[in-house]
Amino acid sequence: MATIYKVTLINETEG
């Protein structure tokens, strides 16, 4: 579950 959270965070930062 932490992986999805991390990917979401990166995607949000990348824009």
UniProtKB/Swiss-Prot annotation:
Co-factor: note: Binds 1 [2Fe-2S] cluster.
Named cofactor requirement(s): [2Fe-2S] cluster
Coiled coil: none
Organism superkingdom: Bacteria
GO molecular function: 2 iron, 2 sulfur cluster binding; metal ion binding
Keyword field: 2Fe-2S, Electron transport, Iron, Iron-sulfur, Metal-binding, Transport
Keyword Iron tagged: yes
Domain 2Fe-2S ferredoxin-type: 5-15
Family designation: Belongs to the 2Fe2S plant-type ferredoxin family.
Functional note: Ferredoxins are iron-sulfur proteins that transfer electrons in a wide variety of metabolic reactions.
Name assigned to this protein: Ferredoxin
Organism: Anabaena sp. (strain L31)
